[in-house]
Amino acid sequence: LRNVEQQCRADALVERAQELIHGQQ
């Protein structure tokens, strides 16, 4: 079930990216 692990990491990266985007605005 490494796919789940990768998906969780991807979700975390997306959340960080969204935070950075909101922070710039």
UniProtKB/Swiss-Prot annotation:
Name this polypeptide is given: Ribosome-inactivating protein charantin
GO terms of biological process kind: negative regulation of translation
Additional remark text: IC(50) of translation-inhibiting activity is of 400 nM.
Function, as annotated: Inhibits cell-free translation in a rabbit reticulocyte lysate system.
GO molecular function terms noted in the UniProt entry: rRNA N-glycosylase activity; toxin activity
Class of the enzyme per the UniProt entry, highest EC level: hydrolase
Superkingdom of origin: Eukaryota
Keywords attached to this entry: Glycosidase, Hydrolase, Protein synthesis inhibitor, Toxin
Reactions this protein catalyses: Endohydrolysis of the N-glycosidic bond at one specific adenosine on the 28S rRNA
Keyword presence, Cytoplasm: no
Keyword Hydrolase (UniProt): yes
SUBUNIT field: Monomer.
Entry EC no(s): 3.2.2.22
Natural source organism: Momordica charantia
Disulfide bond sites: none
